[in-house]
Amino acid sequence: MKIKQKHVIIGLLMAILMAAFTLRTANIKNIPAGIYPDEAQNGVDAQLANSTGEYKLFYESNYGREGLFINLQALSIKTFGPTEFALKIWSIIFGTLTVLGVFLLASELFQNKIAGLIGAYLIAFSYWAINFSRIGFRAIMVPFILSFSFYFLFKGLRTKKLHDFVIAGLIYGLGVHTYIAFRVSPLVLVALFISLLITRKNFIANYWKHTLVFVVALFITAAPMLFDFFIFNPHHYASRTSAISILNPEVNQGKLVSSIAKTFALSLQKYVVMGDLNMRHNYPPYALLNPLTGVAFLIGLFYIIYKIINLLWLRFRKDIRNEKLDIYIFLFAWLIALLIPEFLASEGNPHALRSIGTLPAVIIISIIPFMWVLKKYNSFGHGFRIFVISSAIATFAFIAIADPVKYFIYFANSPKQHEVFDANLRVVSDYIKAINPSQEKFIVTGSMQRLPIKYLNPNISNTFYFYPGEVQNISPSNTDSAIFIFTGADWDAINYLRTKFPNMTFQDHRNSFGDTFYTLKN
């Protein structure tokens, strides 16, 4: 590659990374409008870990969560305090680095840096990627782990350098510490291994050391969690999954095949037809991909399916080996395998969070039509070249505008977004901060709803939490200064306390987005 061309590519990559970082950090305090209780549970666990010094491999609350992300959040909370930024900075970092990972992996797979730039561009401006890079969920680590580990793996297959396999294994082994969906990813390695046996003569003889090094390296980083899952705490491994698994006869009601067919169809169509209907995961009812990327993905998917069939036929009927088969099988296996956590679950499909491991694969598959046009460009006539250039400019402009506008204008200003992120709980948190610390504050709320308030206000004194069914146990020491705060319309609890303290004034607090809470005070 020429020096000038290299500098241009580096410059474009840096511009894409800067755009990605900006989209993942802009107004992070207020978009999303609240801290969802699942995020806050991470924060509360991280605060407890900081106070006790017990940083765990696995946190059992909230159905159980792998500890790596929470422990990183503990570090940022210790540094920045109990803020939205501290809770989400690691999502921002991993989300931005995944853009770099896709660039590296796509460049390696296509042996073309332009392919890498296109992939980086598509994921940088993707609503799906932006959204989960701005929420404090551990799942955002999965695309990061997979893109970088697979990059070094394919680089090692090309260079035969052992250190690439070591790095690939060490990164891949960390994946078991991230999110439950990662656990199906070994199926991708199995499919790739079979493909390598098919396409390369004497693969085992030539690569047995490299394979061994990769496996040993991944076990080094995975070992602590594997020991926890399979020796010390087997119940950790099974947490969260069995109750919603479509393999459970109580769930599929004896219709396993038809149930899987239905959930698989829902999982696959979400990229281009109807996306996740949960506004925390997507902007419903729109597909996960913008229309142009969605079309590119469909074309790319049909292309790799055709090439897999074609190259397998050539291999077994005419003994023609083509190493590109490895790439096609790898991408297809990645897509299908990382869909398994979604389509084997019975609830909430389509589900953009459970399938987040497919994100890099979907983006890389979407690169294929762009590369076909680029390859054919020189064979086009002058007039058609102008048309192609104009279309490319319009396409990339649309991609850069469509999803950011959807996120920062439509999503950000949607009252529904405030509702699904429990934004009223952050309003309550801000309200509490303005109250004299000496005043008793009785917060009537549910177990999960109290978590954002606790996370944002860990040190405010005279704050007491009660369930709506426990209000009869509330006994303020000074009724003149006590304040009762209700995060929801629990009218039985509200009316009970209004009757018990008739001199207090009831107030409905409601902003323009509909974020609501209630108070009872003198």
Model-derived regions: residue spans:
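Transmembrane-lumen/periplasm boundary regions of multi-pass, lipid-linked membrane glycan transferases
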Residues: 42-50, 79, 156, 174, ...
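Hydrophobic/aromatic-rich transmembrane helices and adjacent perimembrane loops
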Residues: 132-133, 184, 324-377
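Short acidic/glycine- and proline-prone juxtamembrane loop motifs at membrane-interface regions
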Residues: 134-139
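Membrane-interface helix-loop-helix junctions at transmembrane boundaries of multi-pass membrane enzymes
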Residues: 3-8, 108, 113-114, 159-161, ...
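Transmembrane-helix motifs of polytopic, lipid-linked glycan transferases
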Residues: 89-110, 147-148, 152, 299-306
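Membrane-interface transmembrane helices that cradle and orient dolichyl/undecaprenyl
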Residues: 147-165, 175
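Membrane-proximal, lumen/periplasm-facing interface regions of secretory-pathway glyco-
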Residues: 293, 383-437, 444-470, 512-514
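Aromatic/acidic, Gly/Pro-rich catalytic loop(s) in extracytoplasmic/lumenal soluble domains
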Residues: 470-522
